[in-house]
Structure formats: C-alpha cells, structure tokens
C-alpha cells in the first residue's frame, strides 16, 4: 500500500492519531536526532474515530474491545492494548473505515465485561467513557 509519505533519515516512531478534529486518521513520525513530522490526512475516505477513556486504575481502558458493523455486513474489531511497538505507543483514538456506508453500529465490551451499544454512528469523532 502506497501512503504517499516519504521521509529521510532513521525513522523509528510513528503514531496514528486524530490531530485536527475531522475524524480522519493522521500520521506523526519521529526521526532520530531530528524533529517530529505530522502529516494530516487529506483523503476523502470516511472514518469513525472513537476516543476511548477509561477510569481510575485503567485510564486507557486496556482490555476493552470495540466492534464496528456497517449495513453492508462489514465488521471491524479493535482491542485496546497497553503498548505499541518499538519506540511507539498506541493512541486512545481508534479508527474504523466506513467504506461506501454512511453509518454503522459501535459495540464496546469494557474490561469489566459490561457492554455498550451505539447505533447510527456517522463519520467523525465519538467520545466514550467507561463508567
């Protein structure tokens, strides 16, 4: 897959996050002995960004499972983890592609087993807090 991003130098860290409030995932990179570079996604693809917040003792809601289903039958699942990869860390915003759909259903199973369902979720950002 060609991202269209070209970096020079010894690039070690990357994060996918939502930096400008449009609900589309953006990229940020670090280069050894260099500055941070951020690339805002200018594609016309449709995404739902879910910002998830935990509670005391598990502020990142590690162990939560998010499932997004569209009307055309596409299902995507993401588990919230506590790590990333070498010199990287996963952000608290999780992204789901809408494809040709305009909305879908978001289901969350929190680390304590409680379930929450949100219907008719459209492109953009959704904030969820574990209660």
Q: What feature does the model see in each segment?
A:
Residues 1-131:
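Gly/Ser/Thr/Pro-enriched helix-cap/hinge segments flanking short amphipathic alpha-helices
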């Amino acid at each position: 897959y060609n991202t269209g991003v070209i970096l020079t130098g010894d690039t070690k860290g990357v994060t996918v996050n939502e930096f400008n409030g449009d609900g589309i995932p953006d990229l940020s990179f670090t280069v050894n002995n260099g500055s941070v570079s951020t690339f805002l996604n200018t594609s016309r693809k449709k995404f739902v960004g879910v910002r998830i917040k935990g509670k005391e003792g598990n502020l990142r809601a590690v162990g939560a499972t998010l499932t997004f289903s569209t009307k055309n039958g596409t299902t995507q699942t993401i588990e919230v983890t506590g790590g990333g990869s070498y010199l990287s860390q996963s952000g608290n915003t999780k992204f789901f592609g809408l494809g040709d759909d305009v909305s879908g259903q978001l289901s969350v199973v929190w680390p304590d087993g409680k379930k929450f369902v949100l219907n008719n979720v459209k492109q953009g950002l959704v904030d969820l807090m574990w209660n």
